[in-house]
């Protein structure tokens, strides 16, 4: 994963997937790029490394940059973060009940571990991501389910 920051940021800008969270997934899945799958297959994210045969079934990429692009474009943007897609269970890391974790990983604490890694990286990097984003909350009381109330801050 060394010297791959630009690849993460470029793919964030191209496909809308947060670079810090992608880095967290890569760090967890590949032990910071040191796992045998990362080294032998250029696969930072454990893509298709199923529990029963991770080394055999994991995808092989021509380079780490190609792997990062495929993860951002195909796996995240077009599948796990695409509403209506079979793997979509919410646009957040989550756990085994909701979010990316439902279909991505067997570890029920996968999302929590990535969030902790991302928080630590952001904290050590000057907290550039902390409080940067607004969260949209869909008003599910509306019968048409078409309104989206965006709040600047929490209220009671």
Regions found by a protein language model. Give the residues of each.
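Catalytic cores of secreted/periplasmic lytic hydrolases that degrade extracellular macromolecules
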Residues: 1-22, 31-149, 156
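The canonical Cys-X-X-Cys-His
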Residues: 25
């Amino acid at each position: 994963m060394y010297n791959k920051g630009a690849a993460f940021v470029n793919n964030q800008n191209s496909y809308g997937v947060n670079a810090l969270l992608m880095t967290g997934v890569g760090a967890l899945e590949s032990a910071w790029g040191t796992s045998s799958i990362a080294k032998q297959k250029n696969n930072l994210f454990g893509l298709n490394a199923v529990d029963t045969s991770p080394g055999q079934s994991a995808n092989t990429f021509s380079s780490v940059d190609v792997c990062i692009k495929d993860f951002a474009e195909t796996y995240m943007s077009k599948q796990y973060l695409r509403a209506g897609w079979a793997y979509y269970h919410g646009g957040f890391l989550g756990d085994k009940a909701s979010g990316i974790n439902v279909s991505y990983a067997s570890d029920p604490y996968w999302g929590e571990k990535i969030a902790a890694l991302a928080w630590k990286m952001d904290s050590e990097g000057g907290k550039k991501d902390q409080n940067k984003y607004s969260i949209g909350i869909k008003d599910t009381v509306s019968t048409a389910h078409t309104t989206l109330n965006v709040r600047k801050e929490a209220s009671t």
